[in-house]
């Protein structure tokens, strides 16, 4: 779950129906986190991102997110423009259960919304109304909401990508004006060597027909790979390994829930602890990997390749 300390303008235990102004403009990179509980007798509830709050005529709804429990047991998404609904997009992979708590994380991307529930990617919804017009959040139906939080971010996909805390190595990766993402294969040197307390963040978007990609922490001088993270979407395996003294070690694959799917936006956080690396994806802890390469201070390079659009890399 995302820490509340990372969110702004948190509203606790709002009364439903809930309609309120969103205090800042929603731009790509903005995040909305809604935590709540589905009552036993709920038939449906909805989360609406609106342009205004007018009842007559009814305000436009840029994104209507509507879990339904009676008969259909699905999520219906739609857009309301000039009091007319568009075509429904229906998701049958239903993550909500009656009498169970939930966490909805909605990420605003340049061309679509990305929705995850309880740490699992659920759906993508292409913008039919410019998200910058959204100024109101509405929640309706039979649902108990514990908290609503926001994280307003800069436009990750239209600004020139930054690489805070890294120095790019490959000439082809040097940013050109107007470029929306980093070229692959990507390689960059950390401005400070790896060690306990250090963090690396990789942000990207998985390609639609992705097979796999990899994120590696490398000891530049020896070219040993201390940490090889290799999500394989074709088999839903999150493979971890090390390449030491010109040989791969034993793969680690155990994971509770595979956190990636085609088309999704992700933020991968790699935290170096004394005994292990800890990895989280979109705010949800995924795995630990015990250090096989013991000289942590020799780890000075980040390498990324595979079937993704690489948007941002950071280290501190």
Curated annotation (Swiss-Prot):
PROSITE patterns: GALECTIN. One of its GO terms (molecular function) is integrin binding. CDD domains: GLECT. InterPro entries: ConA-like_dom_sf, Galectin-like, Galectin_CRD. A beta-D-galactoside binds at residues 248-254. The record marks 58 as: Critical for binding to sialylated and sulfated oligosaccharides. The keyword Ribonucleoprotein does not apply. Expressed in liver, kidney, cardiac muscle, lung, and brain. GO terms for biological process: cellular response to virus; lymphatic endothelial cell migration; plasma cell differentiation; T cell costimulation; xenophagy. A carbohydrate binds at residues 68, 78, 88. Keywords: Autophagy, Cytoplasm, Cytoplasmic vesicle, Lectin, Repeat. Residues 18-151, 186-316 form the Galectin domain. It is found in: Cytoplasmic vesicle; Cytoplasm, Cytosol. The keyword Repeat applies. One of its GO terms (cellular component) is cytoplasm. It holds the Pfam family Gal-bind_lectin. Homodimer. Interacts with CALCOCO2/NDP52. Interacts with PDPN; the interaction is glycosylation-dependent; may participate in connection of the lymphatic endothelium to the surrounding extracellular matrix. Contains two homologous but distinct carbohydrate-binding domains. Beta-galactoside-binding lectin that acts as a sensor of membrane damage caused by infection and restricts the proliferation of infecting pathogens by targeting them for autophagy. Detects membrane rupture by binding beta-galactoside ligands located on the lumenal side of the endosome membrane; these ligands becoming exposed to the cytoplasm following rupture. Restricts infection by initiating autophagy via interaction with CALCOCO2/NDP52. Required to restrict infection of bacterial invasion such as S.typhimurium. Also required to restrict infection of Picornaviridae viruses. This is Galectin-8. It comes from Rattus norvegicus. The lineage of its organism: Eukaryota, Metazoa, Chordata, Craniata, Vertebrata.
């Amino acid at each position: 779950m995302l820490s509340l300390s990372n969110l702004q303008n948190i509203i606790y235990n709002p009364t439903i129906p809930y309609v309120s102004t969103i205090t800042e403009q929603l731009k790509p990179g903005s995040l909305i986190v809604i935590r709540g509980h589905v009552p036993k007798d709920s038939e449906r509830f909805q989360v609406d991102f609106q342009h205004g709050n007018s009842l007559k005529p009814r305000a436009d709804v840029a994104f209507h997110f509507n879990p339904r429990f009676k008969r259909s047991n699905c999520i219906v998404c739609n857009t309301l423009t000039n009091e007319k609904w568009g075509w429904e997009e229906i998701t049958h992979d239903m993550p909500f259960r009656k009498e169970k708590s939930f966490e909805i994380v909605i990420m605003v991307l340049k061309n679509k919304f990305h929705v995850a529930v309880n740490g699992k990617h659920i759906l993508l919804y292409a913008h039919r109304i410019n998200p910058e017009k959204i100024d109101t959040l509405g929640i309706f139906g039979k649902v108990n909401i514990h908290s609503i939080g926001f994280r307003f971010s800069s436009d990750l996909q239209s600004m020139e990508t930054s690489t805070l805390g890294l120095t790019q190595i490959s000439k082809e990766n040097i940013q050109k004006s107007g470029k929306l993402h980093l070229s692959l294969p990507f390689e960059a040197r950390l401005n400070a060597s790896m060690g306990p307390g250090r963090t690396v963040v990789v942000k990207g978007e998985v390609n639609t027909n992705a097979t796999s990609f990899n994120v590696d922490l490398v000891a530049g001088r020896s070219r040993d790979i201390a940490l090889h993270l290799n999500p394989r979407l074709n088999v839903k395996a999150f493979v971890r390994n090390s390449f030491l003294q010109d040989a791969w070690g034993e793969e680690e694959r155990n994971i509770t829930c595979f956190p990636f799917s085609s088309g999704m936006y992700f933020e991968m956080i790699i935290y170096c602890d004394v005994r292990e690396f800890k990895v989280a994806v979109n705010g949800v802890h995924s795995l630990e990997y015990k250090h096989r390469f013991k000289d942590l201070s020799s780890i000075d390079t980040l390498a990324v390749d595979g079937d993704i659009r690489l948007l941002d890399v950071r280290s501190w």
